[in-house]
Amino acid sequence: MRALVIALLLAVVAVSSGAETIDPAVAALLRAVETSGCQMERNGELHEGKAAADHLRLKLERSGRLGMNADQFIDRVASGSTVSGKPYRVLCPGRAPVDSGAWLRARLAEHGRPG
């Protein structure tokens, strides 16, 4: 019985510590990637919006810092590959490719937040 109580207490602590939520500005950036109609280039491969956003969500979750703000997200998660060090680029129809950090900061500015 004692072991069960301890296990339940540990489960409650684990759940409560994992209750960190994604910053609303970061969530908006992920939606922008997903719905923009643009592609993201990662390590030489192109990915449609949904796949790109899913990858960034996974990187964010793996960072262990879901609560990071938009600037931290751009700098630490969404600007480039942690494996190769290569920058991510965004390719939108009819426009020149741009580094993802600049593209994401422009999305922040569109929502009234300087990037």
Regions found by a protein language model. Name each.
Residues M1-L4:
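Positively charged n-region of N-terminal signal peptides that target proteins for export
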Residues L8-L10:
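Compositionally biased, low-complexity intrinsically disordered regions
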Residues V13-S16:
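N-terminal signal peptide c-region/cleavage motif recognized by signal peptidases
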